[in-house]
């Protein structure tokens, strides 16, 4: 989750988020190099005493500043396209989770099991435990196994919502009448926080998402207890 004075992205908890962070750093490095080069050229232009009154055109320099940006854009576009295809790929999921956005809470259904569904509301500040996170903790967490391919189906019951968990690199719009899907793979246990990322009304800020990633054997026990109860 985000912490105070954190200038970077959240620590990744999935392979896709690691790839997104690598691409961010790759693009940022190129932007810094361009900024330094342009700044240096502007500095040299403003603070030198050389004047060429007879310079009308320069085919060489024009060719350079046309071809060089095209090459730079290719270095950005190729990894970006690779990531787009990776993010859109569904790899034989072990578990399917369905998320339904409401004003202003989330409903969840475990489609592979019978009668496992619940609503997830934000815990109000006056009911929050001393070790809880304000505006982020919920009464019912999503329990998911680590090291398993997970598919999530997202829709909405009223207005457009967006199911977002930054540490997993997941952001899926929930649109009424439409079922969107994506997949993710959690590679470590822990709690991962997210929020609705589409303005959906007065209480848009009070729709947190909490995923609890656990080992597979603990997940099976939780499923068994939920089915029996």
From Swiss-Prot:
Single GO MF descriptor: copper ion binding
Keywords: Copper, Electron transport, Magnesium, Membrane, Metal-binding, Mitochondrion, Mitochondrion inner membrane, Respiratory chain, Translocase, Transmembrane, Transmembrane helix, Transport
Cofactor(s) needed: Cu cation
Mitochondrial matrix topology ranges: 49-62
Record's keyword annotation contains Metal-binding: yes
Amino acids binding Mg(2+): 198
GO cellular component: mitochondrial inner membrane
Cofactor annotation comment: Binds a dinuclear copper A center per subunit.
Annotated positions binding Cu cation A1: 161, 196, 200, 207
Highest taxon of source: Eukaryota
Chief location: mitochondrion
Protein residues bound to Cu cation A2: 196, 198, 200, 204
GO biological process: ATP synthesis coupled electron transport
Membrane topology: Multi-pass membrane protein
Compartment(s) of residence: Mitochondrion inner membrane
EC numbers: 7.1.1.9
A Pfam short name: COX2
Spans within the Mitochondrial intermembrane topological domain: 1-26, 83-229
Subunit structure, interactors included: Component of the cytochrome c oxidase (complex IV, CIV), a multisubunit enzyme composed of a catalytic core of 3 subunits and several supernumerary subunits. The complex exists as a monomer or a dimer and forms supercomplexes (SCs) in the inner mitochondrial membrane with ubiquinol-cytochrome c oxidoreductase (cytochrome b-c1 complex, complex III, CIII).
Family to which this protein belongs: Belongs to the cytochrome c oxidase subunit 2 family.
Primary role: Component of the cytochrome c oxidase, the last enzyme in the mitochondrial electron transport chain which drives oxidative phosphorylation. The respiratory chain contains 3 multisubunit complexes succinate dehydrogenase (complex II, CII), ubiquinol-cytochrome c oxidoreductase (cytochrome b-c1 complex, complex III, CIII) and cytochrome c oxidase (complex IV, CIV), that cooperate to transfer electrons derived from NADH and succinate to molecular oxygen, creating an electrochemical gradient over the inner membrane that drives transmembrane transport and the ATP synthase.
NCBIfam families for this protein: CoxB
Name by which UniProt lists this protein: Cytochrome c oxidase subunit 2
Organism in which the protein naturally occurs: Drosophila narragansett (Fruit fly)
């Amino acid at each position: 989750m985000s912490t105070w004075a954190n200038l970077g992205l959240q620590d990744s908890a999935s392979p896709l988020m690691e790839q997104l962070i690598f691409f961010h750093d790759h693009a940022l490095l190129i932007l810094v190099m361009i900024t330094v080069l342009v700044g240096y050229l502007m500095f040299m232009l403003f603070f030198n005493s050389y004047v060429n009154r007879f310079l009308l055109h320069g085919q060489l320099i024009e060719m350079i500043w046309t071809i060089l940006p095209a090459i730079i854009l290719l270095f950005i576009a190729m990894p970006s396209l690779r990531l787009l295809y990776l993010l859109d790929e569904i790899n034989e999921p072990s578990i399917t989770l369905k998320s339904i956005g409401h004003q202003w809470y989330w409903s969840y259904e475990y489609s592979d099991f019978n009668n496992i569904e619940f609503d997830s509301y934000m815990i109000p500040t006056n009911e929050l435990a001393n070790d809880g996170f304000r505006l982020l903790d919920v009464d019912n967490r999503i329990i998911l196994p680590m090291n398993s391919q997970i598919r999530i189906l997202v829709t909405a019951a009223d207005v457009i919502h967006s199911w977002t968990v930054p540490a997993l690199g997941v952001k899926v719009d929930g649109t009424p009448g439409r079922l969107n899907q994506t997949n993710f793979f959690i590679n470590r246990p822990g709690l991962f926080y997210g929020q609705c990322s589409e303005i959906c009304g007065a209480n848009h800020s009070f729709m947190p998402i909490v995923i609890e990633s656990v080992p597979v054997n603990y997940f099976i026990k939780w499923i068994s207890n939920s089915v029996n109860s």
